[in-house]
């Protein structure tokens, strides 16, 4: 993990088995992850939003991965949530079909959690929609995901991470099966 420790020493990673009984409140701007007792999640959201509307979408579990439906252009996608991902990832086969919805298409080098560098394609997705929340100019890498999809029943079209989760406070509720984007 030394390649992950460029500014902060990391002693380990938390996984689904650690926080599966909790709801997670991500506040990337504040640099906090709050574990919420699921019985207080709605009250916490109401307190944080002051009654302003939120975007709430259902999640479906695929093993240990929470998944949401998303839309890019006319293309409906099934995306896993990876709160540790520095960027978003879509399967390589979407590179050509999503061409009209992308800007800044190029090849780049990506270093994965295994510290191995790979040449990949990257671009910014002009508009990605989850529920009624629209995200613009989302930096995205296109690459093979067969190693992950091989172990999943339905498979994924990609993963969302920091670019989506960091734009606002976000709650991931495993117990109630929903992803909540706060205003």
Task: Give the role of each language-model region.
Residues 1-183:
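Pepsin/retropepsin-fold aspartyl endopeptidases
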């Amino acid at each position: 993990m030394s390649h992950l420790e460029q500014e902060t020493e990391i002693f380990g990673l938390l996984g689904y088995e650690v926080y599966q009984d909790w709801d997670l409140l991500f506040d990337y701007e504040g640099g906090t992850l709050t574990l919420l007792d699921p019985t207080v999640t709605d009250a916490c959201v109401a307190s944080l939003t002051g009654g302003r509307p939120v975007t709430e979408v259902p999640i479906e579990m695929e093993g240990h991965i929470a998944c949401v439906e998303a839309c890019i252009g006319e293309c409906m996608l099934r995306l896993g949530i990876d709160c540790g991902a520095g960027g978003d990832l879509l399967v390589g086969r979407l590179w050509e079909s999503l061409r009209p919805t992308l800007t800044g298409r190029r090849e780049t080098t990506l270093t994965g959690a295994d510290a191995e560098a790979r040449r990949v394609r990257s671009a910014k997705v002009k508009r990605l929609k989850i529920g009624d929340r629209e995200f613009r100019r989302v930096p995205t890498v296109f690459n093979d995901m067969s190693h992950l999809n091989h172990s999943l029943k339905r498979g994924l079209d990609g993963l969302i991470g920091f670019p989506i989760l960091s734009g606002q406070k976000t709650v991931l509720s495993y117990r109630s099966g929903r992803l909540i984007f706060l205003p």
